[in-house]
Amino acid sequence: MAMTLRDIINKLLRRQPASASTARERLQLVLAHDRSDLSTELLDQMRKEILEVVAKYVEIDVDEGAVSLETEDRMTALVANLPIKRTITGQIQLKEPKNQSELDSPETEGTDQKS
């Protein structure tokens, strides 16, 4: 089957937005990475730790989830898109801080004190 000139033009025009969109997304990712001044190793460690913390509270689909840097209007954000399978109930009780000094104190990290 021979392609007409119109078919060729339509085919070419449909690919351009997809290619341009992909190139733009890649450029935004590179810019976000550069602006954040984070090494690849540090970003990977952050992703791992974020997934571990979220997994304490909800069951997530790690294979479908993503943690990425996104830039929009000169602002870089760390974005986590994590599909939740179900919540985990009754396993963890959160301790509310009594005052600001407890939030700032590294001594209270990892303690299991009850209010």
Curated annotation (Swiss-Prot):
HAMAP family: MinE (MF_00262). Residues 104-115 have a biased composition (Acidic residues). Prevents the cell division inhibition by proteins MinC and MinD at internal division sites while permitting inhibition at polar sites. This ensures cell division at the proper site by restricting the formation of a division septum at the midpoint of the long axis of the cell. InterPro entries: MinE, MinE_sf. Belongs to the MinE family. It holds the Pfam family MinE. It comes from Prochlorococcus marinus (strain NATL1A). This is Cell division topological specificity factor. GO terms for biological process: cell division; regulation of division septum assembly. Keywords: Cell cycle, Cell division. Residues 93-115 are annotated as: Disordered. The keyword Cell cycle applies.
